[in-house]
Structure formats: structure tokens, C-alpha cells
Amino acid sequence: MSRTPHSVMIADIGYGNCKTILLTQAPEGIVERRWMIPSVVVQTRENLSSLGSSNIRKIQVGGTDIYFGPDILDELGGTQSGMRGAGSHYFESSTYRNLVIANLCESGLAVIDELVLTLPLDYYETAAKELKALRGQYEWQENGIFKTTTVVNVSVQPQALGALIHYRVLNANVGFEKSTRAVLDFGGGTLNFLVAQGYAGKKLRSGHVDYGVRSMWEDMAKEISRQIQASGRVAKFENVALIENAARSGRDYVSTAFGDFEMASLLKQTHSRLVEKVTEAARKMGDVSDILEIVLCGGGAAYIEPAVREVFPVQKIVCLPEPFFANANGFAMLSRKQMAGRELAHAE
């Protein structure tokens, strides 16, 4: 940054959810806001069940209606949309750009000095240049009122670097730069992993496995189907959104037309599958004997932790607090220092 920013937005837009932290300068100091919305935007009102939630916003971009917000999945009535069905180049999609606009709208600011976007390491190099071009002025209408936000600068960062910064700030251990650890980010669409010595990522030992929390919900739906059919009924359960909503709400059961199914039992059935996917990630890392710690983050961190402990019995397992926001938190910590005119130690 050429000057101290007065506003920084960190947007970690993943397959499943968009996690955003907004930092602004105020007379009393740096003020922080954070929010999380599903990575789903809807352009047709008919796709929504009622649009009765106050947690859904409607804006017009270029004459097209866009609906987004925390309750968008509930209003979709069990259907899925947006980035949850996108491929590896999701950052090139119109949904990604609309989610950027949705977050700018949510900020309520006329100017964002620095927009920090995060990407999985696999796509960071190819997409960084393209996403930096997202700076400029954005226009939309809401409730008939014309609004704009200008993004002065865009920086693109590897997601796992944020988790490493977060880890480093919370664990001021000696020898961080010389020790090797792996970050496992179990997100909505993929299990991303980064092997790094200090902050230096080892590209050939990093990557992803095509299995995320969404895949886990689908495996749980198959288990529900199996239990239904074992009871003598001919039916197939495919409403994955019911499972996701039960998990998001902290409910002990998934309530369906075929009865209630215990979440703990369903999760237990996914364990062998999670072990299989973590083992696949470990195999791609190569010789893991030099890895001192495994740092867990992402919305599915709690689900995958038992499998990680089984696959990595020797390494210390560190679960970052607020795993959904772990990547964004790291860059927010760094941005706070920059906004205050100070550098974060060892975070070059």
C-alpha cells in the first residue's frame, strides 16, 4: 500500500460461504465489522420461497435483480445455486463478481481503500492478475436509491497464508521461520492444504482434494437413504440443504418426511470417508516426517479433526479459533497493523 488505508475489506469468498471483515478508521480507533453469507446469489424472485426474511437484500446491478443474505438458503427451499456448483475457476464466474458487489453493498461505504480477496493456492497465481482488475467504481440500486462504492486497490492473497498469520500471532513460538507445518482448510467445496516453512509455502507439496463439507453432507444424505431403504421403504433422500440447515442451527437431528435422523450418528458414518480424504492429502504432501504441526481451519475443521488426528498421530494438531474466519482473521490482523502505521513482525 502506498499510503495508510482508512478502510480495508477482507473477503474470503469460498464455495460454501463468504466470510468478510471490514476495518475502518474512526476517531476512537479502528472499528471492525464482520459478517458471513452463503456464496449464493439469486437473480429470479421465483426461485425464492417467500422472500419474507429481513436477512435477505435485493439490489439491482445493470438492470438485473440480485438477492443475497444470511437466510438465502432457507428461502431457496432446499435448492442450491451459485458457487456451490461452480468448478475450480469459480473466481471467473458472474456469481463471484456479484458476491463482491454484495459485500461492497453490505459495507455501506462509498470508498474501500483496500479490498483483499483470498484464493486457494492452486488458483492464486493464475487468478491474481485478473482479480486485481476488479478495482474501480461499482454501481447499484437498492429501494430505488442509486449507490456507488469505489475500490481504490485490490490485493489477492493465498487463503492459507491468512491462517498462518493468524496462527503466528496467537503462537509466538521461537523458531517459527525454520519449522515446517501444514495448514488444512476444510471448506465448503474442497480440502485445501498448504505445507510451509514459516511463511514460505512449498508449492509442490500443497494443493487440494476434491472433497469438502458439501460432499460430507451428500454422504450423510446417502446414509439417510440407506437407513430409509433398510426399513423397507422405497425412497431416496436428496435434500442436502436440510442437513446443512440442521448443522448450521446446531440441531441434534435432521428432521425429514421419513422421520428424524441423529446428526451424531450420521457424522460417525462419514469418519472413514474423511480419513480416506485426509490420507489422500497426506500422500500428496510427500514425506510428512518434517511437519511439526497441523493447523486446522475452515468451516468443517471440527468435523475433520478426528480424521486428521488419526492420519497424523505424531504431529501436534492446532485448531484455530473461529475456524470459519481463520483466513480472513489473519489478513485482518495484518491490516490492523498497517492501518496503525506498524508492521506485523515476521509477516513480510
What annotation goes with each model-predicted range?
Residues 1-181, 200-213, 241-348:
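Nucleotide/phosphate-binding catalytic cleft detector across ATP-hydrolyzing
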Residues 180-248:
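Aromatic-anchored, glycine/proline-accented short structural segments
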